[in-house]
Amino acid sequence: MSAVVVARRLTVGYGERRVLDGVDTFLASGGSIALVGSNGSGKSTLLKTFAGLLEPLGGVVEVLGGAPREASRSIAYVSQFHRNALALPLRAIDVVRMARFDHRGRFARASVDDETAVAEAMDTMETTELSDVALRDLSGGQQQRVYVAQALARRGAVLLLDEPTSGLDAAGRAAYLRAVERERERGVAVISATHDIGEASTCDRVLLLAGRLIADGPPDVVLTPENLLATFGVGLTRVHDQLVVTEHQHEHGHENGH
C-alpha cells in the first residue's frame, strides 16, 4: 500500500527557529498516527507542516505524492484555535458548510453531494440539533464537535486534527472515535496531536515527540516508561490508558513551540 503522508529527515519550525528535528515517518491510506508530547514538543507545528500551512525548514514532506499545498483540496485540518469563526455571526451549519466551499469561491452553489456531506458529518458528531445555533453561543465542547464535523464534511483523503477531543465530554469523545473509525474504513489517513493516551492507543502508531522524534511504533511498543521519560522528562507509566507519575525527575527542557 502506497504512502499518503511521507516525512524524511524533516525539520519544522517558524522562520529560523527550529521546533522539531529529524522526523522520518509515513502513513498509508486508512492508517492512523497519534502525535504525543508535552507543550512545545512540535506536535502542532508538524501538523501545520503536513497541512501545508508552514514550509519545512529542512528535509522532505509529501502528501499524496507532492507538496502539501498542492494537496490542500484533499486535506481536512482541525486547528486548536478558531478565533476567526467565533468573530463572525455564523451558525453551526454555516461553519460545517465552509468545508465544501473554501476552494470553490464564495458564490458557489451547494450541490446535493455538498448538502449530503454536511448533513452526514453533523449527524456523525451529533450536532444536527445545533444547526441553527450561533457558534459563539455554543459551549466549548459543542464548538469542538462542530469543527470536527466541518473536517468530516470536507471528505478529504487526509484528516489532520490538533487536540480533537479537547473539551469533549464522554459522549462527544465517543462520537469522535466512531467518526475516525468510519473515516479510516473509507481509506482516509488520520493524524492527530493529542495528550489523551486513551485516544492515542486507538491509533496504529504513536510518534513520541520532544523537539525530536523519540519513538515511532505501535502504542503497546512505544508507550514504555523509558520512552515516556525521554518525552516528558518525568517518570510516567501507562495504567488503563492514563499516564501516572511514578517519580519526579529533573526538569526536561523543550524549545518553545507546539
Regions found by a protein language model. Give the residues of each.
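H-loop (His-switch) and adjacent beta-strand-loop-beta switch element
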Residues: C203-P219
